[in-house]
């Protein structure tokens, strides 16, 4: 590319006698190239390489310590306007709602709007043109907090005389704060004394091995870290315990409730029992939840609002004027479970002279206890008086249990059952219940008595729509036709082809209670014809026909004759093929070939006549 100096060009040419100089103002990386100068007497070339100006760090990154939730701004400045990349602990920084990266000229910023503990770490900014990165540390701190949610009113703790107190107070803060317990301005040391403190990363614990009367009073806890301090006072109250010796007993369980009872304390602590508090928890959890805020005056209680299918435990506390007892032992684990809703859509599927088949749909609501099976019962009409009941939305029969005969037990969830061994012309009532681990559902009754007598249902053949016209298949293809039908008792079926019996060695016929199948593995033209089906039940007869046509490729046209040749045209005639492939001829294809090459090309396709004129031939060929 020729360099043309000009007023607005960065290129200038300086001539001093025989010396010519090319001057590039404001050279950039893009100016790196090979430059040539040519004269009438020769040529000279030189390669130019433009490197970036060495960068200098004007303002380095500085380590920062910031409180939790405050904004962090990491800022650095370099001598040139070049981009760069931020990393945290060796990984690229991902921008988001809280974290923004700003590159403005030579100044580069990383802004964290709301500092979290996980934002702590080593941050590095690496400019694209410098090998030495800029490094700083972010240290997030959080003032300590004391969590007293689990204490009684006025931050009071009651301990039973002679028992061990382990008062665990959750604490938070970053870095983890140092905890100091004290009483009456006297520090409680960590160690092995009867009264001692224990420190953990997320809690601080006051331990009294054997509580004594003089241990009552106010205990102070002080937390301190580099972000701040926190203080709290806890009142310790000592009393003689009520003694609950036995765990409560759960006597009945529902879908989200249970009934529990218990024995009064064997010792009332010298003061009459005022009532009881009840707690429950999930078996896999350690968190107990108080169920009553008003004292329960009785020794029985009904917890509610539990989750079906989840194991629970319950325990109780006795209360007198002095205070609250230790908790009782937890009850044995129990699981709230509900019976299913009743089965639905109970209906008669079929009836014979000695059996009745009933079918139904599973319950709409099954629940956590699942579905174990069904109980189906029947009784004969006239066993007892019947009355109307709307409990299930249908007429139901209120019959004594001894009149009902059990037919199926749990273990099968198939919603269908056949009652066998019934006397002909008897009438029976039927009912069904769903069973699961919680017991039996409400009963679903069939709305009316069922007559034990086979009902003749006249036959009916249901020819599929695609078989109502001629069914066409090619030679060698499979034929598989399914013809549904109805009729009771099981109909007698007869197939004929063109009025004659079907050769079962060539055509397979398969019959079931509801359909018949014609199957031909490899169709031949001899399989074409009219197939007649007769379905007979008692004196009732139903007939239907199917036309099957097995087709093949046609034979060649006959008597191809050149009638006339003129110019570049030729007139042809022919007769249809002797073998039409068992289907109407739909057209002809005419091809031509040069005698020298004998390569055939289609001239006319899908032609319906038996004569044609071919044009545009080459004269002399």
From Swiss-Prot:
A Pfam family the protein falls into: fn3
Cellular component terms per the entry's GO annotation: M band; myosin filament
GO molecular function: actin binding; myosin binding
GO biological process: cardiac muscle tissue development; cell adhesion; muscle contraction; sarcomere organization
Residues carrying Phosphoserine: 233
Modified residues (Phosphothreonine): 28, 420
Residue numbers carrying Phosphotyrosine: 445
Record-linked Gene3D superfamilies: Immunoglobulins
PANTHER family assigned: MYOSIN-BINDING PROTEIN C, SLOW-TYPE (PTHR13817:SF27), TITIN (PTHR13817)
Function: Thick filament-associated protein located in the crossbridge region of vertebrate striated muscle a bands. Slow skeletal protein that binds to both myosin and actin. In vitro, binds to native thin filaments and modifies the activity of actin-activated myosin ATPase. May modulate muscle contraction or may play a more structural role.
Family the entry assigns: Belongs to the immunoglobulin superfamily. MyBP family.
Quaternary structure and interacting proteins, as annotated: Interacts with USP25 (isoform USP25m only); the interaction prevents proteasomal degradation of MYBPC1.
Name the UniProt record assigns to this protein: Myosin-binding protein C, slow-type
């Amino acid at each position: 590319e020729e360099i043309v100096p000009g007023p607005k060009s960065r290129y200038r040419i300086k001539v001093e006698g025989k010396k010519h100089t090319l001057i590039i103002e404001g050279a950039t990386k893009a100016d790196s190239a090979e430059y040539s100068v040519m004269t009438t007497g020769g040529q000279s070339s030189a390669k130019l390489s433009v490197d970036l100006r060495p960068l200098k760090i004007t303002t380095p990154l500085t380590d920062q310590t910031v409180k939790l939730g405050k904004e962090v701004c990491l800022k650095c400045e370099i001598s040139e306007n070049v981009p760069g990349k931020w990393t945290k602990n060796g990984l690229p920084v991902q921008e988001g709602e809280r974290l923004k990266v700003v590159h403005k000229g030579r100044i580069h910023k990383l802004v964290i709007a709301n500092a979290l503990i996980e934002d702590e770490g080593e941050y590095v900014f690496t400019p694209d043109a410098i090998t030495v990165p800029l490094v700083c540390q972010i240290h997030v701190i959080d003032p300590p907090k004391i969590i007293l949610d689990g204490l009684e009113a006025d931050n009071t703790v009651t301990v039973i005389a002679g028992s061990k107190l382990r008062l665990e107070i959750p604490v938070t803060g970053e870095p983890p704060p140092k905890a100091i317990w004290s009483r009456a301005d006297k520090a409680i040391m960590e160690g092995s004394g009867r009264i001692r403190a224990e420190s953990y990363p997320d809690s601080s614990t006051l331990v009294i091995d054997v509580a004594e009367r003089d241990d009552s009073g106010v205990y102070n806890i002080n937390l301190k870290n580099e972000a701040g301090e926190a203080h709290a006072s806890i009142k310790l109250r000592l009393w003689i315990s009520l003694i609950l010796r036995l765990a409560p007993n759960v006597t009945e369980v529902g879908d989200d409730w249970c009934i529990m009872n218990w024995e009064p304390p064997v010792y009332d602590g010298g003061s009459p029992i005022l009532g009881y508090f009840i707690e429950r928890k999930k078996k896999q959890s350690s968190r107990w939840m108080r169920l009553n805020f008003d004292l329960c005056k009785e020794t029985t209680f009904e917890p509610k609002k539990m989750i079906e299918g989840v194991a629970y435990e319950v325990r109780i506390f006795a209360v007198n004027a002095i205070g609250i007892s230790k908790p009782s032992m937890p009850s044995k684990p129990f699981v709230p479970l509900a019976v299913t809703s009743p089965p639905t859509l109970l209906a008669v599927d079929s009836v014979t002279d000695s059996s009745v088949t009933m079918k139904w749909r599973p319950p709409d609501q099954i629940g956590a206890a699942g579905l174990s099976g069904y109980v189906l019962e029947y009784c004969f009409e006239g066993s007892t008086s019947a009355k109307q009941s709307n409990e299930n939305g249908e007429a139901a029969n209120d019959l004594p249990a001894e009149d009902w005969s059990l037919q199926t037990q749990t273990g099968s969830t198939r919603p269908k059952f056949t009652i066998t061994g019934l006397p002909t012309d008897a009438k029976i009532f039927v009912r069904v219940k769903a069973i699961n681990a919680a017991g039996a559902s409400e009963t679903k009754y069939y709305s009316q008595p069922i007559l034990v007598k086979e009902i003749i249902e006249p036959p009916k053949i249901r020819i599929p729509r695609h078989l109502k016209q001629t069914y066409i298949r090619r030679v060698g293809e499979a034929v598989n036709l399914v013809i549904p039908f109805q009729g009771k008792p099981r109909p007698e079926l007869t197939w004929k082809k063109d009025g004659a019996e079907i050769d079962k060695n060539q055509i397979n016929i398969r019959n079931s209670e509801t359909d018949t199948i014609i199957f031909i593995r490899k169709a031949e033209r001899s399989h074409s014809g009219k197939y007649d089906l007769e379905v007979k039940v008692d004196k009732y007869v139903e007939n239907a026909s199917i036309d099957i046509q097995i087709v093949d490729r046609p034979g060649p046209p006959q008597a191809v004759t050149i009638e006339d040749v003129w110019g570049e045209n030729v007139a042809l005639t022919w007769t249809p093929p002797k073998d039409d492939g068992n289907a109407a001829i739909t057209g002809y294809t005419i091809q031509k070939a040069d005698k020298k090459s004998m390569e055939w090309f289609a001239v006319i396709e899908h032609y319906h006549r038996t004569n044609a004129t071919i044009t545009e031939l080459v004269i002399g060929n």
